[in-house]
Protein backbone atom coordinates (compact mmCIF):
# COMPACT_ATOMS: atom_id res chain seq x y z
CA UNK A 1 0.00 0.00 0.00
CA UNK A 2 0.89 3.62 -0.47
CA UNK A 3 1.27 4.39 3.24
CA UNK A 4 3.56 1.40 3.83
CA UNK A 5 6.09 2.77 1.31
CA UNK A 6 6.82 5.90 3.35
CA UNK A 7 8.62 6.70 6.60
CA UNK A 8 6.03 9.32 7.60
CA UNK A 9 2.48 10.39 6.74
CA UNK A 10 1.66 14.09 7.04
CA UNK A 11 -1.60 16.02 7.32
CA UNK A 12 -2.61 19.49 8.39
CA UNK A 13 -4.75 20.37 11.37
CA UNK A 14 -7.79 20.87 9.13
CA UNK A 15 -7.71 17.19 8.18
CA UNK A 16 -7.28 16.14 11.83
CA UNK A 17 -10.25 18.24 12.95
CA UNK A 18 -12.48 17.20 10.03
CA UNK A 19 -11.68 13.49 9.77
CA UNK A 20 -9.68 12.34 12.84
CA UNK A 21 -7.52 10.08 10.64
CA UNK A 22 -5.53 7.17 12.09
CA UNK A 23 -2.75 7.58 9.48
CA UNK A 24 -1.72 3.95 9.79
CA UNK A 25 -1.03 1.11 7.36
CA UNK A 26 -4.11 -1.10 7.47
CA UNK A 27 -3.07 -3.89 5.10
CA UNK A 28 -3.95 -7.28 6.64
CA UNK A 29 -0.49 -8.75 5.86
CA UNK A 30 1.52 -5.68 6.98
CA UNK A 31 3.83 -6.53 9.87
CA UNK A 32 6.49 -3.85 9.37
CA UNK A 33 6.76 -0.63 11.33
CA UNK A 34 4.01 1.96 11.11
CA UNK A 35 5.01 5.27 9.52
CA UNK A 36 5.52 8.24 11.82
CA UNK A 37 2.34 10.33 11.92
CA UNK A 38 3.03 14.02 11.35
CA UNK A 39 0.63 16.93 11.88
CA UNK A 40 1.18 20.57 10.94
CA UNK A 41 -0.72 22.50 13.61
CA UNK A 42 0.54 26.07 13.95
CA UNK A 43 -1.88 27.00 16.78
CA UNK A 44 -1.92 23.64 18.61
CA UNK A 45 -5.57 22.79 18.06
CA UNK A 46 -5.08 18.99 17.92
CA UNK A 47 -7.51 17.46 20.43
CA UNK A 48 -6.10 15.15 23.11
CA UNK A 49 -8.68 12.62 21.90
CA UNK A 50 -7.47 12.66 18.27
CA UNK A 51 -6.09 9.37 16.97
CA UNK A 52 -2.81 11.10 16.10
CA UNK A 53 -2.40 12.04 19.79
CA UNK A 54 -2.12 8.36 20.79
CA UNK A 55 1.61 8.05 20.05
CA UNK A 56 4.08 7.51 17.18
CA UNK A 57 3.22 11.08 16.23
CA UNK A 58 5.00 14.37 15.80
CA UNK A 59 3.00 17.61 15.89
CA UNK A 60 4.73 20.69 14.51
CA UNK A 61 3.62 24.08 15.81
CA UNK A 62 4.67 27.71 15.80
CA UNK A 63 3.02 28.21 19.21
CA UNK A 64 4.66 27.37 22.53
CA UNK A 65 4.96 23.59 22.61
CA UNK A 66 2.83 21.79 25.19
CA UNK A 67 1.98 18.09 25.51
CA UNK A 68 -0.93 16.67 23.53
CA UNK A 69 -1.66 13.09 24.56
CA UNK A 70 1.27 10.79 23.77
CA UNK A 71 2.29 12.78 20.69
CA UNK A 72 5.58 14.65 20.64
CA UNK A 73 5.11 18.37 20.00
CA UNK A 74 7.92 20.32 18.30
CA UNK A 75 8.06 24.09 17.96
CA UNK A 76 9.46 25.33 14.65
CA UNK A 77 10.06 28.72 13.06
CA UNK A 78 7.05 30.68 11.90
CA UNK A 79 6.63 31.38 8.18
CA UNK A 80 3.67 33.75 7.71
CA UNK A 81 1.65 32.16 10.51
CA UNK A 82 2.47 28.58 9.50
CA UNK A 83 5.24 26.13 10.29
CA UNK A 84 8.32 26.68 8.13
CA UNK A 85 8.25 23.60 5.89
CA UNK A 86 12.03 23.51 5.42
CA UNK A 87 12.45 23.44 9.22
CA UNK A 88 9.85 20.66 9.47
CA UNK A 89 11.71 18.57 6.88
CA UNK A 90 15.04 19.25 8.63
CA UNK A 91 13.64 17.85 11.90
CA UNK A 92 12.18 14.81 10.12
CA UNK A 93 15.45 14.17 8.26
CA UNK A 94 17.42 14.34 11.52
CA UNK A 95 15.11 11.59 12.82
CA UNK A 96 15.80 9.32 9.86
CA UNK A 97 12.69 10.14 7.82
CA UNK A 98 13.57 10.00 4.11
CA UNK A 99 10.11 9.73 2.53
CA UNK A 100 6.99 11.68 3.52
CA UNK A 101 3.50 11.01 2.20
CA UNK A 102 1.52 14.26 2.31
CA UNK A 103 -1.98 12.88 2.63
CA UNK A 104 -4.01 16.03 3.26
CA UNK A 105 -5.19 18.69 2.93
CA UNK A 106 -5.12 21.24 0.21
CA UNK A 107 -3.28 23.92 2.21
CA UNK A 108 -0.46 21.53 3.16
CA UNK A 109 -0.14 20.30 -0.44
CA UNK A 110 -0.06 23.87 -1.76
CA UNK A 111 2.59 24.87 0.77
CA UNK A 112 4.93 22.07 -0.28
CA UNK A 113 4.32 22.79 -3.97
CA UNK A 114 4.97 26.54 -3.50
CA UNK A 115 8.26 25.74 -1.75
CA UNK A 116 9.28 23.31 -4.52
CA UNK A 117 9.45 20.42 -2.02
CA UNK A 118 7.42 17.83 -3.96
CA UNK A 119 9.28 15.15 -5.94
CA UNK A 120 6.36 12.91 -6.81
CA UNK A 121 2.57 12.91 -6.55
CA UNK A 122 0.08 10.06 -6.49
CA UNK A 123 -3.61 10.76 -6.57
CA UNK A 124 -6.99 9.29 -7.32
CA UNK A 125 -9.59 11.10 -9.41
CA UNK A 126 -13.25 10.16 -9.44
CA UNK A 127 -15.34 10.75 -12.57
CA UNK A 128 -17.55 13.34 -10.89
CA UNK A 129 -17.53 17.14 -10.93
CA UNK A 130 -18.21 19.05 -7.72
CA UNK A 131 -17.46 22.58 -8.82
CA UNK A 132 -16.79 25.18 -6.16
CA UNK A 133 -18.75 23.11 -3.60
CA UNK A 134 -16.01 20.46 -3.55
CA UNK A 135 -12.82 20.39 -1.50
CA UNK A 136 -9.73 21.33 -3.45
CA UNK A 137 -6.85 18.85 -3.33
CA UNK A 138 -4.41 21.76 -3.70
CA UNK A 139 -5.18 25.22 -2.31
CA UNK A 140 -4.19 28.44 -4.08
CA UNK A 141 -0.61 28.52 -5.34
CA UNK A 142 -0.63 32.31 -5.95
CA UNK A 143 0.92 32.00 -9.39
CA UNK A 144 1.81 35.20 -11.23
CA UNK A 145 1.66 33.41 -14.59
CA UNK A 146 0.98 29.96 -16.00
CA UNK A 147 4.69 29.40 -16.64
CA UNK A 148 5.23 29.50 -12.85
CA UNK A 149 3.00 26.45 -12.28
CA UNK A 150 4.74 23.32 -10.95
CA UNK A 151 5.21 20.85 -13.81
CA UNK A 152 5.00 17.08 -13.62
CA UNK A 153 5.46 14.13 -15.96
CA UNK A 154 2.96 11.26 -15.82
CA UNK A 155 4.81 8.07 -14.80
CA UNK A 156 1.87 5.69 -14.36
CA UNK A 157 -1.89 5.64 -14.74
CA UNK A 158 -4.41 2.92 -13.89
CA UNK A 159 -8.15 2.50 -13.48
CA UNK A 160 -8.92 1.39 -9.91
CA UNK A 161 -12.57 0.56 -9.39
CA UNK A 162 -14.35 3.53 -10.91
CA UNK A 163 -11.48 5.95 -10.23
CA UNK A 164 -8.31 6.89 -12.04
CA UNK A 165 -4.97 6.62 -10.19
CA UNK A 166 -1.97 8.59 -11.42
CA UNK A 167 1.67 8.83 -10.40
CA UNK A 168 3.36 12.06 -11.43
CA UNK A 169 7.04 12.99 -11.16
CA UNK A 170 8.36 16.55 -10.89
CA UNK A 171 10.08 17.83 -14.02
Task: For every predicted segment, state its role.
Residues 3-4, 53, 93, 113-114, ...:
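Alpha-helix boundary recognition
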Amino acid sequence: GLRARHDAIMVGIGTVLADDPALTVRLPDHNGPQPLRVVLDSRLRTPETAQVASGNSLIFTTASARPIGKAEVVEVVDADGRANLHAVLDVLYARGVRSVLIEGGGEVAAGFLRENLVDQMEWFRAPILLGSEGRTCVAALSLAKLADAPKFRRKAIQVVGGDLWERLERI
